Every structure is written in structure tokens, then in C-alpha cells.
């Protein structure tokens, strides 16, 4: 099973930078998730081209936490000069405003979209000790243990996609929150959680290494 998350670059509304002078210094790219996450991988690939294309370096600033809200807030409150960008996902760019009663910034007024970078698939992965080979097997196991099936979540995208799947399958899962995908995948391998719906960059190396099972 795969779902997709979209990545895009946003910046605080710029009022100072002009085409004639921009960029005149390094550009900070805030990644609202931990190093090693798919968003981090995409962000680093993107900023690696800054010096070649713009003549200035791009500097990654990882600000994980609160489903991306911490990083998004840092960009919203940065100087609106075009030198601080947000490498966001549908968590930061869309879901947070629906899931939280109040955000520490105005989603519509504090950001300006700059570019769409691409999309990344999420893959349902389980601990190797589980006697399941397919989603059908996993659903049957979860139905036999309602509420006991623990899944990891390190972002809004991961949580929403897993809960949508659970609702469609008619099963009850229990979420275990994590600050980052790398931390969650470590606990999945160790058997602290049973399932993790995570991005390709995090899951596939472990699936190929035989440490977890992709469904």
C-alpha cells in the first residue's frame, strides 16, 4: 500500500529582496523534520544546487517537532527577505491548519509558495516478527487484537494516512508518537511498535536489508 506526500518550498512573504540584489548571502532552508527523513533528503538535494544556480550557498536548518509546526513557525517569524525558506510537506502546508485549533502563525498570510519539488510515497511496513505477509494478513491480525496493535507516527501525514487506512479496514490501532521517522524506524526494527507507515527514503533501505517487512 502506498500513499503520497507532496513537498514544496515556501518562504515568509518577501518585501525586501529584489531581482537585482538577490541573493547576496547564504539562503537558509528550514526542514521541519529530522535529519534522515524524506523531507530532509529532498531539501538537501535542492539546496545542493543553490551555489551552482544562484551563486550563493544553501544551508539546511533542521527544526523537527510538533508535526512540522516548529519549523514552519520559525520561517513565518523570520525576516521577510527571501533568505529563509521552508521545505514543507502536506503536513505543514495543509494538514496542520485543519488539525490544530490555533497555529502560532497565519497559514494564508505568512507564507508565499515558491516551488513544488515533488512527491514521495509512504509504505506500510511491519516488524519482521509479525506473522503477516500482506495487508489482508495484517488487517486480520489487528482485528483479533483491537487496540493492541501499535503503530508509529512521526508526522501528520503518517498519522492521517494510517488512520484513514484503519478506518477503511475497520480496525482499531493505537498510535505511538515519535519526534522523527529515523527514531520510529529504529523502534519498529526493535519490535517496540508493530507498524509504521513511512516515506520511501526511511523504509526501503531497511526493507531491502531484511530488517522490516514492507506490505
Language-model segments: what does each one mean?
Residues 14-16:
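N-terminal signal peptide c-region/cleavage motif recognized by signal peptidases
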Residues 25-34, 58-59, 84-87, 112, ...:
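Short, well-ordered beta-strand elements
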Residues 29-44, 66, 151-156:
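Extracytoplasmic "Venus flytrap"
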Residues 36, 75-76, 162, 188-189, ...:
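Hydrophobic residues within well-ordered alpha-helices
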Residues 50, 77-82, 98-183:
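Hinge/capping helix and adjacent helix->loop/strand transition within the periplasmic-binding protein
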Residues 56, 78-87, 145-149, 171, ...:
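Alpha-to-beta junction loops
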Residues 63-71, 120, 175-186, 199-202:
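Short helix-initiation/N-cap motifs at beta->coil->alpha
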Residues 92-102, 159, 163-168, 195-215:
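A ligand-binding cleft/hinge motif common to bilobed small-molecule-binding domains
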Amino acid at each position: 500500500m502506498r500513499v503520497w506526500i507532496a513537498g514544496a518550498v515556501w518562504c515568509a512573504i518577501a518585501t525586501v529582496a529584489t531581482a537585482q540584489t538577490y541573493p547576496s548571502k547564504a539562503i537558509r532552508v528550514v526542514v521541519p523534520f529530522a535529519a534522515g527523513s524524506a523531507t530532509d533528503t529532498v531539501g538537501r538535494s535542492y539546496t545542493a544546487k543553490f551555489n551552482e544556480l544562484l551563486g550563493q550557498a544553501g544551508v539546511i536548518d533542521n527544526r523537527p517537532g510538533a508535526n512540522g509546526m516548529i519549523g514552519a513557525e520559525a520561517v513565518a517569524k523570520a525576516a521577510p527577505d527571501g533568505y529563509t525558506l521552508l521545505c514543507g510537506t502536506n503536513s505543514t502546508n495543509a494538514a496542520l491548519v485543519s488539525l490544530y485549533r490555533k497555529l502560532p502563525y497565519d497559514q494564508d498570510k505568512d507564507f508565499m509558495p515558491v516551488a513544488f519539488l515533488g512527491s514521495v510515497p509512504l509504505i506500510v511496513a511491519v516488524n519482521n516478527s509479525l506473522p503477516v505477509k500482506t495487508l489482508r494478513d495484517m488487517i486480520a491480525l489487528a482485528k483479533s487484537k483491537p487496540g493492541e496493535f501499535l503503530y508509529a507516527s512521526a508526522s501528520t501525514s503518517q498519522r492521517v494516512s494510517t488512520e484513514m487506512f484503519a478506518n477503511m479496514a475497520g480496525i482499531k490501532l493505537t498510535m505511538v508518537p515519535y519526534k522523527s521517522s529515523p527514531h520510529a524506524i529504529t523502534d519498529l526494527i526493535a519490535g517496540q511498535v508493530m507498524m509504521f507507515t513511512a516515506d520511501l527514503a526511511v523504509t526501503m533501505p531497511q526493507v531491502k536489508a531484511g530488517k522490516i517487512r514492507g506490505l
